[in-house]
Amino acid sequence: MSKRTTYCGLVTEAFLGQEITLKGWVNNRRDLGGLIFVDLRDREGIVQVVFNPAFSEEALKIAETVRSEYVVEVQGTVTKRDPETVNPKIKTGQVEVQVTNIKVINKSETPPFSINEENVNVDENIRLKYRYLDLRRQELAQTFKMRHQITRSIRQYLDDEGFFDIETPVLTKSTPEGARDYLVPSRVHDGEFYALPQSPQLFKQLLMISGFDKYYQIVKCFRDEDLRADRQPEFTQVDIEMSFVDQEDVMQMGEEMLKKVVKEVKGVEINGAFPRMTYKEAMRRYGSDKPDTRFEMELIDVSQLGRDMDFKVFKDTVENDGEIKAIVAKGAAEQYTRKDMDALTEFVNIYGAKGLAWVKVVEDGLTGPIGRFFETENVETLLTLTGAEAGDLVMFVADKPNVVAQSLGALRVKLAKELGLIDETKLNFLWVTDWPLLEYDEDAKRYVAAHHPFTSPKEADIAKLGTAPEEAEANAYDIVLNGYELGGGSIRIHDGELQEKMFEVLGFTKEQAQEQFGFLLDAFKYGAPPHGGIALGLDRLVMLLTNRTNLRDTIAFPKTASATCLLTNAPGEVSDKQLEELSLRIRH
């Protein structure tokens, strides 16, 4: 077997006149009667190879037998294509290879779907079952090439900044808070279980107490939670921790790293600092803690209308400490019919809204179901508050503040997609800061950590832990990209007494805290430095930088929405012998 000269997708005019050896898969084959053209494919792309009896009759005969997805080796001379046959759609479109020798390395059965880039309308379950074939498609091959470039850029940046890449355990202890753990039974310790890590949070804090100062890890994490388009049961995290830093230091580091990645991978220079917004401002203006700022359509408080108008829904909402907010779809009045508005009403119902009120602005006032409730002065108030003009569609939700935020926040994104308001070429990074430290869980009747129990409160709010925990703010920060939470971080608690107080507020007894987190509390007794960090979702970063819409397209062998692997049929049953060794019995 001859040595490969280069990749198929890298054969350019620089190789003109050279005899080269290529190896790859037959993407397609065209027999023109006396001449056979084959598009030969590998991970870098496609090149056209020509079988001409003038160069080799024997090679032509073999080429007559090859079919799609055969693995072949060809030798030949690189020549310039005739001007009328140049293919500007591919990198190698100026040249072709006149084949003098071909060897069939391996044959292929007819694939269950075409690998050709033009045929992508295949049921996703079929693609996942034959994932090794799906990954041959150039679109996915380029996605994973970019994933490699992104991780390489991250590693180079962190290495240059003095971070140590340190691995942490995969078999660890199950702890409360957060999503459900994936559990691993121990054979050696009867009836006891390990948990797969949801993140290396506690270990990276222990590494700071160990004195390593700067740590990072590109690490697998596991969460047994309900899936959606941007969630997987196992995912990859860029995990970072630093000692003797404050919030500003961590945010600056994260920002510089992301700018470097975007410049190296996308060729895009991001000038200036990333915009910042407090959690309260994000919720007030966008109804989301991860707002998409590529378009406007902000939420506008029009609660004044509830005090001025004789419209029972608005009036009752304000009297019961609710609020009324509106969004304006510019120029969309004619585009949305009453049937469309009914569909939008059903959409906001999903988020708890009882209804969606709306009006269309016309030259002489308002039309729509609630237009008749607006007196002249009410119309003026609405137009002044919202800036709405003739031709605009104004939508209202009147309810509790959290319902208003969630429903209108989701609606603005839906409308932006329908109206084509989103510039898909933009990369809008945003820091969301000043998060609540705690949230109240109505079902459990207790406080839970908004991020995790190891996030430090702002120094001015420490006293509130004993008096008004719901008012305490955290030294926490999330990085958002185009409406997706890319990652989050915080300055951690490094004082044992404060950590114990935090556990107490979260409803742990001293005994429970010691049993679950005693190793951390013990470590705090031996001199813990101030420390903080951030964790970024690598799969999600790749998804956004490659303009994919599904996280599964960025993971080589992903799970389905029901957390199954269609390729290997995992999860699967195990033998009675294995269960017996683990002292387990399955109840059906």
Swiss-Prot record:
Give the residues the record marks as binding L-aspartate: E177, R223, H451, R492
The protein here is known as Aspartate--tRNA ligase
> Where mainly located?
cytoplasm
- Name the CDD domains on file: AspRS_core, EcAspRS_like_N
**Which protein family is it in?**
Belongs to the class-II aminoacyl-tRNA synthetase family. Type 1 subfamily.
The subcellular localization recorded is: Cytoplasm
> What is this protein for, i.e. what is its function?
Catalyzes the attachment of L-aspartate to tRNA(Asp) in a two-step reaction: L-aspartate is first activated by ATP to form Asp-AMP and then transferred to the acceptor end of tRNA(Asp).
State the organism of origin.
Staphylococcus aureus (strain JH9)
Record EC number: 6.1.1.12
**Could you give the subunit structure recorded for this chain?**
Homodimer.
Residues where ATP binds: R223, D224, E225, Q232, E485, G537, L538, D539, R540
Provide a GO CC annotation, any one. cytoplasm
Q: Which PANTHER family match?
A: ASPARTATE--TRNA LIGASE, MITOCHONDRIAL, ASPARTYL/LYSYL-TRNA SYNTHETASE
Q: Please give the Gene Ontology molecular function terms for this protein.
A: aspartate-tRNA ligase activity; ATP binding; catalytic activity, acting on a protein; nucleic acid binding; transferase activity
Q: Where is this region: Aspartate?
A: 201-204
PROSITE patterns according to UniProt: AA_TRNA_LIGASE_II (PS50862)
Query: Which UniProt keyword terms apply here?
Result: Aminoacyl-tRNA synthetase, ATP-binding, Cytoplasm, Ligase, Nucleotide-binding, Protein biosynthesis
Q: Which reaction does it catalyse?
A: tRNA(Asp) + L-aspartate + ATP = L-aspartyl-tRNA(Asp) + AMP + diphosphate
Superkingdom of source? Bacteria
What is its EC class? ligase
* One record GO biological process: aspartyl-tRNA aminoacylation
